Curated annotation (Swiss-Prot):
NCBIfam families: Obg_CgtA (TIGR02729), Obg_CgtA_exten (TIGR03595), PRK12296.1 (NF008954), PRK12297.1 (NF008955), PRK12299.1 (NF008956), small_GTP (TIGR00231). The gene is obg. One of its GO terms (cellular component) is cytoplasm. It comes from Streptococcus pyogenes serotype M5 (strain Manfredo). The lineage of its organism: Bacteria, Bacillati, Bacillota, Bacilli, Lactobacillales. This is GTPase Obg. Residues 161-338 form the OBG-type G domain. An essential GTPase which binds GTP, GDP and possibly (p)ppGpp with moderate affinity, with high nucleotide exchange rates and a fairly low GTP hydrolysis rate. Plays a role in control of the cell cycle, stress response, ribosome biogenesis and in those bacteria that undergo differentiation, in morphogenesis control.
Length: 437
């Protein structure tokens, strides 16, 4: 089984905030001794951190649930509960994080040490010392801790490489990478010897350096899933320059120009933006018989597809095995990289709106009202539900406070407008109570 994994589905859950405490101190002439209950500690957040030492998402094959710890409860003497530590989850460079429900991109992690809060820990509930007022100097009110965020995520790794080698199987991509870098890809005289991407650092004689990726061979229909399909096409997306390697000896019995057209069609079908990347045509195996004649025919067919004044793609005849023509190829690649900016990987439409994602959207509705088949009024909404779960329903004062909050939000008035009558059942989550008009 391959130890390379570039996709994963996981769930993350931040820690719940600790509950606030109801407590009183003993003090003469102070009702109930005065409030003394402290706040709960914050729940731990789930944070993704980039580790450049990781190369795959293999760690997520069997470990798919990540849960941060909850904060401690508030204590007497007004002391706060201890906040929980954040849970750090390490991911490789080039990891894209998507919301599994919407498919939107939450973040794209590309820099070593980069950190992003993926699920925010809940805040601690306030203790009764926070609710003391001149009218109520000894409140029996404390909040429950806020639940931590919970999310279903899709992770996708797209390796970071400046240059990507593409081409049919057995055209010499792995050999080229092994010759120009210290990478040691598997090389064999059969198709799909390379079944995972290989990455190597290339340094030219003039001192320029860049990362080069050897990607598994493509065949016609790859964008529809034939062969290794689109499994590794995603890794081309981060490259700025594509080296299109072609077996100019036609040792497999295919026409080199037809190979060139087929691979470009697959790239275009998979992602139209891949064709925006500049290409250098690498005419490999030029030390083989008939390679020179095939190259002449290739150039003629290629020129026929361009207007007289168009710039044709650069073509570099090489032999990876014989180490011929490599210096010129690498220097030209470095020069092309120097004048090629990074390509936008995601449009704004692909990205999660941060304000909406973290619950700060101005358009967020406080509540919604629906009616079940059993005639029960059902209240829902992120803000309302957050207030509800933080209310200690075991204490009368907390319940009365929650009722005042509902009135302040306009829930009572909205229920009346919808036709609610005195005594009608109303439900929030699993909690049910009667409407009082």
């Amino acid at each position: 089984m391959s130890m390379f994994l570039d996709t994963a589905k996981i769930s993350v859950q931040a820690g719940r905030g600790g509950d606030g405490m109801v407590a009183f101190r003993r003090e003469k002439y102070v009702p109930n001794g005065g409030p003394w209950g402290g706040d709960g500690g914050k729940g731990g957040s789930v944070i993704f951190r980039v580790d450049e030492g990781l190369r795959t998402l293999m760690d997520f094959r069997y470990n798919r649930k990540f849960k941060a710890k909850s904060g401690e409860k508030g204590m007497t003497k007004g002391m706060h509960g201890r906040g929980a530590e954040d849970l750090i989850v390490f991911v490789p460079q080039g990891t894209t994080v998507r919301d599994a429900e919407t498919g939107k991109v939450i973040t794209d992690l590309v820099e070593h040490g980069q950190e992003v809060v993926i699920a925010k820990g809940g805040r601690g509930g306030r203790g009764n010392i926070r609710f003391a007022t001149p009218r109520n100097p000894a409140p029996e009110i404390a909040e429950n801790g806020e639940p931590g965020e919970e999310r279903q995520l899709e992770l996708e790794l797209k390796i970071l490489a400046d240059v990507g080698l593409v081409g049919f199987p057995s055209v010499g991509k792995s050999t080229l990478l092994s010759v120009v870098s210290s990478a040691k890809p598997k090389i064999g005289a059969y198709h799909f010897t390379t079944i995972v991407p290989n990455l190597g650092m290339v340094r030219t004689k003039s001192g320029d350096s860049f990362a080069m990726a050897d990607l598994p061979g493509l065949i016609e229909g790859a964008s529809q899933g034939i062969g290794l399909g689109t499994q590794f096409l995603r890794h081309i997306e981060r490259t700025r320059v594509i080296l299109h390697v072609i077996d100019m000896s036609a040792s497999e019995g295919r026409d080199p120009y037809e190979d060139y057209v087929s691979i470009n069609n697959e790239l275009e079908t998979y992602n139209l933006r891949l064709m925006e990347r500049p290409q250098i045509i690498v005419a490999n195996k030029m030390d083989m018989p008939e390679a020179q004649e095939n190259l002449k025919a290739f150039k003629k067919k290629l020129a026929a597809q361009y207007d007289e004044f168009d710039d044709l793609p650069m073509i570099f005849p090489i032999s990876s095995l014989a180490h011929q023509g490599l210096e010129n190829l690498l220097e030209a690649t470095a020069e092309l990289l120097a004048k090629t900016d990074e390509f936008l990987l995601y449009d704004e439409a692909d990205l999660v709106d941060e304000e909406a994602y973290y619950g700060f959207a101005e358009t967020e509705k406080d509540f919604e009202i629906t009616r079940d088949d059993d005639a029960t009024w059902v209240l829902s909404g992120e803000k309302l539900e957050r207030l509800f779960v933080m209310t200690n329903m075991e204490r009368d004062e907390s319940i009365m406070k929650f009722a005042r909050q509902l009135r302040g939000m306009g829930v009572d008035e909205a229920l009346r407008e919808r036709g609610a009558k005195d005594g009608d059942p109303v439900r929030i989550g699993k909690f049910e109570f009667e409407f009082v008009d």
